[in-house]
């Protein structure tokens, strides 16, 4: 909860992503200490998803810093109009970070919370509150950076940046196309079903 609350008040884009990272590691700890199949499997998926999504968010921060020479959220706005390619990638990674269903962040967070509820209901309720805070600060950041009125007009992502960012969405959006069982929804269903039957 501490990481989420500190992220809520960050004016710096890089610090917000860093504190959101701390907050997401709480789901790993929660899943491990739940010590059941859902919790442990959820912790593994959160670690994998976190590595992909957070590195992509730091890449997005680097792109915007390269153009504006600042990381203050208040200095950006209107990037969906001025930098549509960048804003698309930032939106995808923001939604994956907050755990939107269908993206890589959802399965791990859901399993960690499910494992926590099985071990201790109070821990599950607290984890659910962290999900709400996470959605709050990530959506606030995306709204300010992408849709708020812009003070300047930085150019859109150039070819090398766009190609680098274009490789990241595939695993974030599920990974099942490459036979990746870690984030495959069928594996999630099987683990949950086996645990429910025991």
Name every feature range the model reports, one short phrase each.
Residues 1-149, 157, 162:
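Hydrophobic transmembrane alpha-helices and their helix-loop junctions in integral membrane proteins
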Residues 83-86, 140-198:
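Cytoplasmic/organellar membrane-interface segments at the starts of transmembrane helices
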């Amino acid at each position: 909860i501490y990481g989420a609350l500190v992220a809520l008040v960050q004016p710096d884009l890089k610090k917000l992503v860093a504190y959101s990272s701390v907050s997401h590691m709480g789901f790993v700890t929660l899943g491990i200490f739940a010590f059941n199949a859902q919790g442990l499997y959820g912790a593994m998926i959160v670690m994998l998803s976190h590595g992909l999504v957070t590195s992509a968010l730091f890449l997005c921060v680097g792109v915007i810093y390269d153009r504006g020479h600042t990381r203050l959220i208040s200095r950006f706005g209107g990037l969906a109009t001025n930098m549509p390619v960048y804003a698309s990638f930032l939106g995808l990674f923001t939604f994956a970070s907050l755990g939107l269903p269908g993206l890589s962040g959802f399965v791990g967070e859901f399993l960690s919370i499910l494992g926590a509820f099985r071990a201790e209901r109070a821990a599950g309720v607290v984890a659910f509150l962290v999900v709400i805070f996470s959605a709050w600060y990530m959506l606030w950041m995306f709204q300010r950076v992408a849709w708020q009125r812009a003070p300047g007009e930085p150019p859109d992502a150039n070819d090398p940046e766009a190609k680098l960012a274009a490789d990241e969405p595939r695993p974030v959006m599920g990974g099942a196309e490459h036979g990746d069982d870690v984030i495959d929804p069928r594996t999630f269903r099987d683990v949950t079903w086996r645990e429910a039957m025991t």
